[in-house]
């Protein structure tokens, strides 16, 4: 049988498989393989017993509701609960904005880029960013432009942001995509004054801000949470994205967008085209969980669980770095970013990691440009056990030492 020739749309020509998911397919399944890679929650984080109890109530009270077609916007009760929490705990304006329940936060960003990005438009991001956002932007013919990240300021370079927008005389830049709280992959949180500055610059140039906040509830340090960029928004210039994946279960595929009402209406239209509505069973389950239990108590449990893991990883890195690595200490979230010293050969380092059965995420995978951060790698501390964290960091230290010894001297 001859091979059929398919004429695919030009918008998919430049897309590549998500490198994080591709890497997952090829991870060695050796018994002692330690994965410090994926942004997965711990299995200990899932409120299994509570969900089992309330599932009986959901089946009894809402069986026909979740088996039938549903509202695109999401079930009213869950949307109201989200609004109440955002208003009470984040001081966000829920009167001039509305909540759309999405099929995971990934769909949320897809919908936003779908309504704002035309072929040839530009979306600004941090230089190191979530790879899923990069693919979503490219899928609509958009160009991803990474802004320099100021590690000392824990923020994008706001001078570069201002200069970039001032130079955009054709108004091709449509959205600034940011993860300002516990950034992925770096782990830092943008300071309050930088958030205000970013908002002011984008408002002046009429560029939408997409504030992606999947980790925002997971603050482990004894500090006051930094206000969201959305909390400054009085003119409808910010779309705020939240998720249940990191605080309930990624299998729920529940996310949400808080968007200005005019934007909300367009998002609803696009979601009707995409999948009509998010999983109704999980919407009712999440809503019932919030009704029947203290959801803040559940989040506090997650903070305690993950703080111990983060502290263990930080302590292990501090003990085992041996002047070969430096790392960012986050206040929360899922990740720690590590930088290898320049005298370590990265190719050899990753080969040594593979031989030692340890998985990390290389920095170039998380780069907006797909390159340029070869000396960096990302570690996840939420999924592995404490023992795996300690052993994993020890193996990483050994790999770094081996790579340092083999690097050819510069002549």
Regions found by a protein language model. Give the residues of each.
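N-terminal small-domain helix-loop-helix segment of the aminotransferase-like
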Residues: 13-104, 291, 359, 403, ...
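Conserved core of the PLP fold type I
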Residues: 65-206, 210, 217-235, 306, ...
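Conserved core segment of the aminotransferase class I/II
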Residues: 231-304
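Short hydrophobic/aromatic beta-strand micro-patches
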Residues: 258, 337-339, 380-382
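Conserved glycine-rich beta-strand-loop-beta hairpin in the small C-terminal domain of fold type I
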Residues: 287, 303-314, 326-339
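Conserved PLP-binding catalytic core of the aspartate aminotransferase-like
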Residues: 324-357
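PLP-dependent enzyme catalytic core of the Aspartate aminotransferase-like
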Residues: 355-356, 368-411
């Amino acid at each position: 049988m001859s091979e059929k020739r398919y004429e695919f749309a030009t918008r998919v020509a430049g897309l590549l498989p998500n490198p994080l998911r591709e890497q997952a397919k090829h991870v060695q399944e050796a018994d002692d393989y330690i994965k410090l890679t994926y942004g997965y929650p711990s299995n200990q984080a899932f409120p299994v017993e509570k969900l089992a109890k309330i599932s009986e109530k959901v089946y009894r009270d809402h069986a026909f509701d979740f088996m039938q077609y549903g509202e695109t916007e999401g079930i009213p009760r869950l949307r109201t609960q989200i609004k109440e929490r955002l208003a009470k705990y984040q001081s966000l304006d829920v009167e001039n904005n509305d909540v759309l329940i999405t099929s995971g936060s990934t769909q949320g960003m897809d919908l936003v880029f779908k309504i704002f990005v035309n072929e040839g438009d530009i979306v600004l991001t941090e230089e190191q960013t979530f790879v899923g956002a990069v693919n979503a932007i490219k899928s609509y013919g958009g160009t991803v432009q990474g802004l320099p990240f100021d590690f000392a300021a824990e923020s994008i370079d706001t001078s570069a942001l201002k200069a970039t927008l001032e130079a955009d005389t054709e108004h091709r830049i449509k959205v600034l995509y940011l993860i300002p709280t516990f950034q992925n992959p770096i782990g830092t949180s943008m300071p309050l004054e930088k958030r205000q500055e970013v908002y002011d610059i984008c408002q002046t140039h009429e560029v939408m801000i997409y504030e992606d906040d999947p980790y925002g509830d997971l603050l482990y340090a004894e500090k006051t949470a930094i206000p969201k960029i959305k909390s400054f928004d009085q003119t409808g210039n910010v779309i705020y994205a939240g998720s249940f994946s990191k605080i309930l279960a990624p299998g729920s595929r529940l996310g949400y967008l808080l968007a200005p009402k005019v934007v909300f209406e367009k998002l609803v239209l696009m979601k009707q085209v995409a999948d009509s509505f998010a999983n109704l069973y999980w919407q009712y389950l999440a809503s019932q969980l919030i009704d029947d239990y203290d959801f803040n108590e559940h989040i506090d449990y997650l903070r305690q669980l993950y703080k111990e893991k983060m502290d263990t990883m930080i302590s292990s890195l501090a003990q085992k770095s041996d002047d070969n690595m430096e790392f960012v200490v986050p206040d929360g979230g899922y990740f720690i970013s590590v930088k290898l010293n320049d005298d370590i050969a990265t190719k050899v380092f990753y080969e040594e990691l593979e031989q030692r059965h340890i998985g990390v995420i290389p920095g170039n995978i998380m780069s907006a440009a797909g390159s340029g951060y070869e000396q960096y790698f990302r570690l996840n501390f939420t999924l592995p056990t404490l023992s795996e964290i300690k052993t994993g960091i020890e193996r990483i230290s050994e790999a770094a030492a081996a790579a340092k010894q083999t690097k050819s001297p510069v002549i």
